[in-house]
Amino acid sequence: MSKIIFMGTPDFSTKVLEMLIAEHEVIAVVTQPDRPVGRKKVMTPPPVKRVATKHQIPVYQPEKLKDSQELDVLLSLESDLIVTAAFGQLLPESLLNAPKLGAINVHASLLPKYRGGAPIHQAIIDGEEETGITIMYMVKKLDAGNIISQQSIRIEEEDNVGTMHDKLSFLGAELLKKTLPSIIDNTNDSIPQDDALATFASNIRREDERIDWNMSAQAIHNHIRGLSPWPVAYTTMNEKNLKLFSAFIVKGKKGNPGTIIEATKHELIIATGSDDAIALTEIQPAGKKRMKVTDYLSGVQESLVGKVLL
């Protein structure tokens, strides 16, 4: 049985780790340090750590893997293979070259498209109708190694980051399970990526979360989907932030971009930079919980029609 070091951090990684534990010998897990979460800043372990601890697998949590004591330990383990899935750090070249079978990554896009840390978000924001999982050999350059296997999946109009995250996490574990035998036997026919076709999905920044109402309704809809339920798109109303969780396109309604042109029982309808509008259905006003627009409107006394979102 192959000795595997697993490296990953968020929920996306847990399905891959659970599959590896069931099918192989995981000798160590490397994940990010515990972080403060929520208003009370409670120190919280990454999801991967919880899975590893449950199975009594040694866990290492370096702030930065390069030049750390943990790196020396990992190099001494004589592993057969390193598997990563959304780990969140680049691996030192010494570690990439240490295992007998190399290091592989489970990446949530159809490489060479969407290299980087936010491939699911960016694919939806860009209006892609398809994405997938790539199993690839790791090299020093980010997400640029040879492709071992790929599997695609449709992005439906109603999908958002949350639903695609769940679909892709299961798909990643399934594809890795099918692919691992050829990696372990060294019988796979990996193919180089075409760097000329590479696109990038950098981590989402705060400024990326703000809605530009001058964009088309389709682009705004994709932006809301591509950031929901995390980190969440937002706009401002009455100089207060308003988070936007779900919406749909209303054809043929126009007005000055960002203006509330109608407030129905269930939606706030906002003009955009195109001939169509956006109907907001689920929001989170500043200082309040996430709620349906229906519930929000029931507590609002003034008319919102004519107000401008910025």
UniProtKB/Swiss-Prot annotation:
It catalyses: L-methionyl-tRNA(fMet) + (6R)-10-formyltetrahydrofolate = N-formyl-L-methionyl-tRNA(fMet) + (6S)-5,6,7,8-tetrahydrofolate + H(+). The keyword GTP-binding does not apply. Gene3D superfamilies: Formyl transferase, C-terminal domain, Formyl transferase, N-terminal domain. Signal peptide: none annotated. InterPro entries: Fmt (IPR005794), Formyl_trans_C (IPR005793), Formyl_trans_C_sf (IPR037022), Formyl_transf_N (IPR002376), Formyl_transf_N_sf (IPR036477), Formyl_transferase-like_C_sf (IPR011034), GART_AS (IPR001555), Met-tRNA-FMT_C (IPR044135). Keywords: Protein biosynthesis, Transferase. Attaches a formyl group to the free amino group of methionyl-tRNA(fMet). The formyl group appears to play a dual role in the initiator identity of N-formylmethionyl-tRNA by promoting its recognition by IF2 and preventing the misappropriation of this tRNA by the elongation apparatus. Belongs to the Fmt family. This is Methionyl-tRNA formyltransferase. It comes from Staphylococcus epidermidis (strain ATCC 35984 / DSM 28319 / BCRC 17069 / CCUG 31568 / BM 3577 / RP62A). The gene is fmt.
